[in-house]
């Protein structure tokens, strides 16, 4: 249990480090944007006098500067003042951070790199070969500082979340656009990989975080030799910055205040459920990737192949996980806790972290319930699994409830379709058999003299109309087809009865008129 607790604490600290790393990346981009704005304002004054500086700026613009030059004209003095205030608070925090780092473990790379970055002038920022060098150095330094700053990272998260919320209200779109360009410039290899590969790498980021951290530590040691820098750069950029891009886009879309606590809640909820599986997987990742960090970059490239195979397994499971999000944590339905899967479904890396070992490590898992559950997961389609496998399982209640929830909508859909087909068939048959309906009327009508009298005696149809309808209404408890036919026949007979009564009334009115006409003529004759 102690080993699993250590693994879980390491995973949670790595998740916190990832959120802090993304926030630090946004800070760095804001600093760079502010530096570019100051460099453009400094370059505007000597443009009139020095033609050489103007040509050099026009000759070597980087992709980031080209994007920054578009939103720079609407930037006003108020925004510059806000940026300067944010930069001041960051400098104070950076000094505090350096003091704590000096107490814990003195890292000399961070102040040196920051001095180099702060000493960059407006002429040097426009040159291209310095820009990728700065970015390559930024990755390991940031990761090292985050690993050593584990215990007091929560206080920094709160302060940074407040400032970032203030800053992102003003310029959210620019940060998203520049984050994408920064990640695309950092990873030339990641441009070859398609978009679903990026998602899968981001979803496998939580279990494989330890290995990437150890590789970054080895990268800082090998950074000083320029020969080894190029293959290590490709191996790290394939693993680390690609999930950063998706995670940054997730966090800029969602409010940043909410993301770290939701991550922690999801991790804590899954800690009670899948502790053994994830501890085994984390130990496997740790062993393989620590040995990988000690070896040459060729083995780093070789070890990416099993990662891609794991990604292909995740592709086979991904549509099923999206169609049925209840199945992603297996034991969560056994404990009947619906709240954790809803929280974990917001973050796809965590849900697939639980799902992948259930298929990969069937032989390693000791618990029999998970074995039966994963064997049922391997079936062809989830709907057929749920109610075919449920009578065989006695210990778990989840497939019964799940089969009920799956069966009801399927059965209602089938009944609705059948009813629609019946109604259409009835309408067609009525439209076809409407001329010959007089035959069926005599056969279907209930027996009785009062009900058949209106067929022969039209004079009494108005009086006897109420009796047959009541008799028919009592006898209408039949099948749907017969009732529909009877209703049609009743409506037709009512129409015919109404026509007959109208004819009787017309005849009566004609006779009355004739009588009135004869009466005044006779009276006139009598008067004469």
UniProtKB/Swiss-Prot annotation:
Keywords: Basement membrane, Extracellular matrix, Phosphoprotein, Repeat, Secreted
Any one GO molecular function term: structural molecule activity
InterPro entries per record: Ladinin_1 (IPR017404)
UniProt region (Disordered), positions on chain: 1-404, 492-528
Basic residues: compositionally biased ranges: 88-97
Subcellular location: Secreted, Extracellular space, Extracellular matrix, Basement membrane
UniProt modified residues of type Phosphoserine: 38, 56, 62, 72, 76, 119, 328, 358, 367, 405, 496
Highest taxon above the source species: Eukaryota
Any one cellular-component term (Gene Ontology): extracellular region
SEK repeat intervals: 184-186, 190-192, 202-204, 208-210, 269-271, 279-281
Feature: compositional bias, Polar residues: 304-316, 518-528
Tissue specificity: Expressed in kidney, lung and keratinocytes followed by liver, spleen and brain. Not expressed in testis, skeletal and heart muscle and in fibroblasts.
Positions of the UniProt region annotated as 6 X SEK repeats: 184-281
UniProt feature, compositional bias: Basic and acidic residues: 134-173, 218-231, 267-279, 495-510
Principal subcellular localization: secreted
KW Nucleotide-binding (keyword) present: no
Amino acid composition bias (Low complexity), ranges on this chain: 365-377
Function: Anchoring filament protein which is a component of the basement membrane zone.
Protein name, per record: Ladinin-1
Organism the protein comes from: Mus musculus
